[in-house]
Amino acid sequence: MNKELVLVVDFGGQYNQLIARRVRENRVYCEIVPYTTSIEDIKEKAPKGIIFTGGPNSVYGENAPRVQKELFDLGIPVLGICYGDQLMAHSLEGEVTSPEKREYGKTDVNLDNSSLLFKDMKEKDQCWMSHTDYISKVPKGFKIIATTDECPCAAMENVEKKLYGVQFHPEVEHTLFGKKMLKNFLFNVCNLKGDWSMSSFAEQQIKAIKEKVGDKKVICALSGGVDSSVAAVIVHKAIGKQLTCIFVDHGLLRKDEGDQVEKIFKDQFDMNLIRVNAQDRFLGKLKGVSDPERKRKIIGEEFIRVFEEEAKKLGNISFLVQGTIYPDIVESGTNTSATIKSHHNVGGLPEDMEFKLIEPLRELFKDEVRAVGEELGIPHKLVWRQPFPGPGLAIRVLGEVTEEKLAITREADAIFREEIAKAGLEEKIWQYFACLPNIQSVGVMGDERTYCHTIALRAVTSSDAMTSDWARIPYEVLDKVSRRIVNEVKEVNRIVYDVTSKPPATIEWE
C-alpha cells in the first residue's frame, strides 16, 4: 500500500514533534527529516506536502540552516512556520528584518479568509507568536494574507506554486484556529485523502520487521508497560516464536506487577517469556547512588547486561526490541533540542551494546501507541495501563534507593491507584503515582510525636506527554487517599499533592 506522505523538515524548533502529531491527527502519515536532506532524497520519498518547522536561528546567522532553492520548484506544496516562513522568504529573495522589539505570546491576527489556508475562518483571531525577525518584504509572486500590529507579514502565499508561510505557530493550542489551518493546508492545498490509520501502521511495521529479521532470533525488553507490550505484540505477530521476551524483575516494580506481567504474556499471548529475578543485583548497583541521572544510566546499563547474559544462554540473538516512543527521543535530546533528562530507552544504552535495535513505536505518540494496541487486540485494561518509566520506582524514590523506601512507595502508590480506579478516574487522568521525596517531617499520631516520611502524589492530564497539566482530582478522593496512606503505611505521616504543570516541571520527579 502506497501511503500519502508529508515531510516535516526539522530546523531545530521546540514544537517539531507537535507539528507531526497535528498532521497525524488528520490521518495523514508524516516523517520528520533533517533540513540537510537532499533534493534527491526528497524526490525519492515523493511527499505530497512539506512543512518547514520553526527554529532558534536567524536567516542571517553564519551557521543558519538552509535548504536548496530548487526545493521550491518541485511542484510540492510547502508550508513554512516561523523560521521556516522566514527562510522561504529569504531563499526566494524577499526581505527579512530584525525589529526593535520581538513578538512573543498570544497575539491578535488579521486573516484573509479568501486564502485556501484560512478558508472558513474568522477575519480576526488569536495566534501564538514567538519570533524576533520578521518578513518586511515578500518575494515576487507572493502576497500577504495575515497581519498583526507588530508584524506586517504574519502569513504569505504564492498560490501558483502552492507555497505558504506563517510567522505564528499553528501547531500549539494557543493558536485557536491552528488545527483548522493545518487541515486546510493538508486537504485544500495538498489535496490529501487522509486514509492513514493505526491498522495500516501495524501492517507496515509487521511487514518491515519480517523483512528485517528474516530467520534470525530476537529478544524483547519487556516491562509490562503499554509501550513495551505493544512493541512485543507487533514483533510477535511478525515473527512468532523467533521472539523471546525477557522480563527483568529488578525489584523496582509496582505492587504485584511482576506476577501480572508473567501471567498475561505467557498465558494469554503464548509468548516465549523468561523472567529474570534481579532485585539484589540492581539494588547492589544502586547502593549509595542518589543522583537521578546516574540512577537512570546504571539501570539502563544493567538492563542491557542482563539481556546480553540471557541472550548468550539462548544463543545467536541478533536483535533487541524496545518500546521507545517519540517523547522519549525528544526528551533525550537526540535531535537539535536540549537534553532535559536521559531516557532509559535512549540515553542509558551502553556504547558496546551487542544487539541491533528494533523500535517499532519510535515514531508514535502515546495515544497512537494505545490505538495500535487496540487494533492488535491487546486487552483494553493493559492498553490503558498507567505509563511507568523503565527505571521504575528508582526514580520515584528520591535520593538513595533502599528496600525499605521501595516498600513504602509501593504501598502508597497501590492505595493511590486503587482509589483513583474506585472514583472512575483511571482513564481520565493521563498518569498518576506516588513518590517518596527525601524528606521527613514532624507529626503527631496517637498523642505521640512522629518523625516520618512524606509521600508526594502526582497526577497529570495530557494526550502525548509532551506537555501536561496537573489533574484536578476531587478533594474527597484526595482526602480518602491521604487518610488511607497515613493509616496503612506506618512510616508515613504527611501527604502532599503536586500542582505543577509540564513545563516547567517534568511529569516524573527524577
Swiss-Prot record:
Entry-linked PROSITE patterns: GATASE_TYPE_1, GMPS_ATP_PPASE
Residues spanning the signal sequence: none
EC nos: 6.3.5.2
Domain called GMPS ATP-PPase: residue spans: 196-385
Pfam families, sorted: GATase, GMP_synt_C, NAD_synthase
Domain Glutamine amidotransferase type-1: start-end pairs: 5-195
Residues annotated for ATP binding in this entry: S223, G224, G225, V226, D227, S228, S229
A single GO cellular-component term on record: cytosol
Pathway(s) this gene product operates in, as recorded in its UniProt entry: Purine metabolism; GMP biosynthesis; GMP from XMP (L-Gln route): step 1/1
Catalytic residues as annotated in Swiss-Prot or TrEMBL: C82 (nucleophile), H169, E171
Matching HAMAP family: GMP_synthase
Function, in words: Catalyzes the synthesis of GMP from XMP.
The protein's name: GMP synthase [glutamine-hydrolyzing]
Organism (species): Clostridium botulinum (strain Kyoto / Type A2)
